[in-house]
Amino acid sequence: MKNRVTVPEIIASKGKRKLSELTAYDYPTALWADQSGIDMLLVGDSLAMVVLGHDDTLSVGMTEMLHHTSAVARGAKRALVIGDMPFMSYQVSVEEALYNAGLFLKEAKAQAVKLEGGRRVAPQVKAMVEAGIPVQGHLGLTPQSSAQFGGFKIQGKTAEAAKILIEDAQILAEAGCFSIVLEGIPSNVAAMVTEAIPVPTIGIGAGPDCDGQVLVIHDVLGLYDRFVPKFVKKYAQLGLTIKEALTKYREEVENGTFPGPEHEFGMAELEAKKLSGLEDKK
């Protein structure tokens, strides 16, 4: 078993090797991803959609996020575990943001947190980093702000918007972010951001020039039954495999072939005779 991936190692990887990041929401998934050598596991607020069935990421709070982050932390022995700060857990004040971020490390045993936004959250990032809490930033298509964007729309498509995005990345890096997720932005803009900051960029729908990539594990494995973004590559169709297995289970229960003799527990012959005798005396 390799040692835990650390924040300094993530930062030092820039320009040397590509980083892999995936979401995870429970113990077994974290275990499998960890054994696959994934560098970072993000307990994303996408939990709301792909695990709990909500229509957006706004429907989870600190209680759910801490609960699932704890499960992932128990399964991941090598990967860096990052807790995603849910909507309104860091926007109200720097003090509240710092307190909630601390809960991810103290109670849920994560090694870092992630939050969305540019310069407006720089004070929160700075306070967290000064308190010893590593922070991953998130720019571009930030799902918690989808209502403001008018839906899940690509960001940074104009020269002015791209300029602001690059500046935001620089501000976040200066505030102390150890990496920054770039979601749903043009590839050339992502390349410019990557060149402009000293910490790794992690792309999701941001092209091949980022320092690493992140995807939602349910999308990767074909486990989500709703819309899958263009930038997703499905590496398996486990949803269909699960459906086939469960259909076979139901059929075998109905036709009596499960459980078979190999699934039964027996009783010693002498004890069986005693039991039969006891029944006969009734």
Swiss-Prot record:
Reaction(s) catalysed by this chain's protein: 3-methyl-2-oxobutanoate + (6R)-5,10-methylene-5,6,7,8-tetrahydrofolate + H2O = 2-dehydropantoate + (6S)-5,6,7,8-tetrahydrofolate
Q: Where in the cell is it found?
A: Cytoplasm
Q: What InterPro entries does the annotation carry? A: Pantoate_hydroxy_MeTrfase, Pyrv/PenolPyrv_kinase-like_dom, Pyrv_kinase-like_dom_sf
Record EC number: 2.1.2.11
> Matching CDD domains, A to Z?
KPHMT-like
**Any keyword Metal-binding?**
yes
What EC class does the entry list?
A: transferase
The residues that hold Mg(2+) are D45, D84, E116
Pathway(s) this gene product operates in, as recorded in its UniProt entry: Cofactor biosynthesis; (R)-pantothenate biosynthesis; (R)-pantoate from 3-methyl-2-oxobutanoate: step 1/2
Q: What cofactors are annotated for this protein? A: Mg(2+)
Keywords assigned: Cytoplasm, Magnesium, Metal-binding, Pantothenate biosynthesis, Transferase
- Record-annotated residues binding 3-methyl-2-oxobutanoate? D45, S46, D84, K114
Could you cite one Gene Ontology molecular function of this protein? magnesium ion binding
May I have one GO cellular component term? cytoplasm
List the catalytic residues.
E183 (proton acceptor)
Please explain the role this protein plays, according to its UniProt record.
Answer: Catalyzes the reversible reaction in which hydroxymethyl group from 5,10-methylenetetrahydrofolate is transferred onto alpha-ketoisovalerate to form ketopantoate.
* Family label: Belongs to the PanB family.
Record protein name field: 3-methyl-2-oxobutanoate hydroxymethyltransferase
